[in-house]
Amino acid sequence: MRVLIAGLMASVFAIAGVSAAQAADRVDQVPEAPVAQEAPVKPAGSWEGFYLGGAGTYNMGDFGSDRHTYGFGGQVFTGYNWQQGQIVYGVESDLGYSGDDVSSGGVENKYGWNGSVRGRVGYDMNPFLLYGTAGLAIGDVKVSDDTSDESKTNFGYTVGAGVEAFVTNNITTRLEYRYTDYQSKDYDLDSGSFSRGYDENSVKLGIGVKF
């Protein structure tokens, strides 16, 4: 009888030992919780990405000899930058209005809405960006006399350079100079036919927001 009881107790301890070992294995095999992968974040001060803004402009224009004009205007701009190391490049467009006008010989010449599509290439000197820009320009030139007027859309080119700086991680300010030259066109008025082009030197002070 004692031999039987001893055998039963040995069997119980053996089963308990096997169960404990299996439980330990199951604990060891509990999968680890997945680690959340953070989305890549652009470093602070990066110029890469979409942006938009606005600028005030001071324009010094010329409709031809003795037809010089000076005035203020404004524009909105938007664009996208890519950045590789310290080289920044991208595309930018703007749309603006300028009330530049001058009268000569009974004929008034006026430069109105205008815009451009340009490329930009710059060098990052964080927090400053020095850049150059060039592209296609489009603008409205209106010529009128006492009894008639005619407006035409003129195309040309624009080139310039500027400096832009971070105010915060997503707010920038810029100072830019541009020269724009439009083609000449003929305007037929009651007082005669007139050929007019327009070229302009402008200084632009603006503020932008990066996204």
From Swiss-Prot:
Pfam families given in the database record: OMP_b-brl
Coiled-coil ranges from the UniProt annotation: none
Signal peptide: 1-23
UniProt KW Signal keyword: yes
GO CC annotations, alphabetized: cell outer membrane
Record keywords: Cell outer membrane, Membrane, Signal
Location relative to the cell: Cell outer membrane
Family membership noted in the UniProt record: Belongs to the Omp25/RopB family.
PANTHER family with a match to the protein in the record: BLL7405 PROTEIN (PTHR34001:SF3)
Protein name per Swiss-Prot or TrEMBL: 22 kDa outer membrane protein
Organism listed in the record: Rhizobium leguminosarum bv. viciae
